[in-house]
Amino acid sequence: MESFIIEGGHPLSGTITPQGAKNEALEVICATLLTDEEVSIDNVPDILDVNNLILLLKDIGVRVERNSKNNYTFCAKEIDLDYLNSEEFIRKCASLRGSVLMIGPLLARFGKAVVAKPGGDKIGRRRLDTHFLGFKNLGAKFVHSESNNTFEIKAKRLKGTNMLLDEASVTGTANIIMAAVLAKGHTTIYNAACEPYIQQLCRMLNNMGAKISGIASNLLTIEGMDRLHGTSHKILPDMIEVGSFIGMAAMVGNGMRIKDVSVENLGIIPEAFRRLGVKILIEGDDLYIPHMPHYQVDSFIDGSIMTLADAPWPGLTPDLLSVLLVVATQARGSVLVHQKMFESRLFFVDKLIDMGAQIILCDPHRAVVVGHDHKVRLRAGRMTSPDIRAGIALLIAALSANGTSRIDNIAQIDRGYEDIEGRLNALGANIKRVNN
């Protein structure tokens, strides 16, 4: 197990470029299973979750060529379907949440998939019902195996239908789309997620020969095809990493430029930071965050406390609430952070309280933050990263703290952030990776 040793108080300045979007990468890499032709994907982030998914595809027979650091070619011409029932495959799927996105493509093209309970973040109950109900609506059958506690999902050929998703799940929508593009007939999906990741997946599939309309809305119509062909695709910049860098620039920045962010796909993210008083300048496709000795939290017109709450797109992504909460600890004013979509993503705040942050955890979903206005720096401490987003939030806190901090279990951070210590050290941070 590895840890970060962070010497706090070093200002960050310079230019940084975000990696490719993790969530989009997981979706489009799994979509390569839908064709026996080559698919080239550019701007693939070099992070743990994506690398493990690529290894899993190799295990089932996908030919993978790494053309450069962030460019891959996939060819799923020959797939070992028997391997899907192996203990090794089931064990690997159970430790990688992104593996659930393989089900839709495998079911659509080969009529068979196996699902184990996937792993990932410990952030409460993440339902897979949306995925499974969607597959059932398309005609799939589920057979439970008590011996290894898995479900084998089968269908001779999926059939298009009309369905209303019980929640606008991003991965659920992606999985159902990938299943429906090879189904017989038309499929209509109401209450579909419409994040940029989903839009990108749909555009890639259309370039492969699929017929998907309603892209960027929550009503998708899909005409099933007999087969899809190869294509090339470029992944968007990671909006979550962009938001993380904005948070760092606010807390410890001395003038930071975030390059090539795809501004039109950031949605409400810049505005959420502006509500905390963070100054963000949009210059072409870059964001520039100047040095700010203070930032003042906005208030509502009626004078009530500023509230930041997550919501399905185009609302605020839940993946950035942890970062916004940390930024609020040094703001001038108070903020209510309301995490609606997961019930234990705020439990890391006890570590911030130990560092001197003024936070009241109201319940598993809500926390009130009273900012220090940069008058009192956080204290250094030793922490453990519980999940990707809390991990990066703790890293931001440690960068701003007085003294040297240690963050354990940084594999959680590595799951979502590429060479984070190297890139931040280039801006002036002092972060060392150590083996325990």
Name the predicted role of every residue range.
Residues M1-N436:
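Short, structured segments at the rim of ligand-binding sites
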